[in-house]
Amino acid sequence: MTFLKMKSLSFFFTILLSLSTLFTISNARKFNVGGSGAWVTNPPENYESWSGKNRFLVHDTLYFSYAKGADSVLEVNKADYDACNTKNPIKRVDDGDSEISLDRYGPFYFISGNEDNCKKGQKLNVVVISARIPSTAQSPHAAAPGSSTPGSMTPPGGAHSPKSSSPVSPTTSPPGSTTPPGGAHSPKSSSAVSPATSPPGSMAPKSGSPVSPTTSPPAPPKSTSPVSPSSAPMTSPPAPMAPKSSSTIPPSSAPMTSPPGSMAPKSSSPVSNSPTVSPSLAPGGSTSSSPSDSPSGSAMGPSGDGPSAAGDISTPAGAPGQKKSSANGMTVMSITTVLSLVLTIFLSA
């Protein structure tokens, strides 16, 4: 069975090859040398110029007409063509009406069998080109004008930097020092901040969470350095030292007393309800950082609509109530779930 299939395929390809050969031969053209076919000395049109005006393909034929016995046509190589050497021709015809087939592509060189006639210009140079099949398929790498290759999109402008996981909160500092820079975007803290006591000139943020009553110590001597809301940190002098607050303070609704002259910036973002303790500045001018409720993208600065100086800061006392409401909600949900289970068991019984 396989042999029969192979035989059929061979026969089919043989037929195709024969048809293509016949089609090529049928398209072959016959050229009269010099336009008239006359193979003579001093032709009306130079053979070289005539050859340059025509396009020769494989299987085309050249027709030479001359007096039989008096002349001939020799096919030679280029060196013999230039020197009109008739002693070692590649092919020779002398029947008077000769047709020579151009069976390959490339140059062909023909001269007269009479050396004197060759020197008088009776020679012909023909260049056969290979037939090209016109290609209709477009190159896959060709790109349309104005089009661009797909690539990655460039993000617009300055992309926001990722939110910092350790933002800086305002802490107690001696007179003349400022808070550390808060230029990075800081996420909203998951715990409320209880700012420590501040001597005069320090910045005390307004907290949205319950704080415990804290009394600031007597004001130390006034520093000669003005307080600036700038985000650039400054080294504080080692002499004044702020009291250290280290104990965990329970939430309450009592106000916090701020020393005269302190500024309270207004927080622009809400904070959550778990109080934590913010460590104060260590001796020697070093600053400490803790999670805070500072707004993202800028350092803390005094606000015009915040509480005035030398006044009590009242803080909302809604956090314990919210915790109590959450506990009540959890209790109600638990009771509802138990009742639903009991009702389901009762109905299924």
From Swiss-Prot:
Proregion residues excised on maturation: 326-349
Annotated transmembrane regions: none
Disordered: annotated span: 136-330
Secretion signal, residue range per the UniProt entry: 1-28
Keywords: Cell membrane, Disulfide bond, Glycoprotein, GPI-anchor, Lipoprotein, Membrane, Signal
Family label: Belongs to the early nodulin-like (ENODL) family.
Protein name from the UniProt record: Early nodulin-like protein 2
Organism: Arabidopsis thaliana
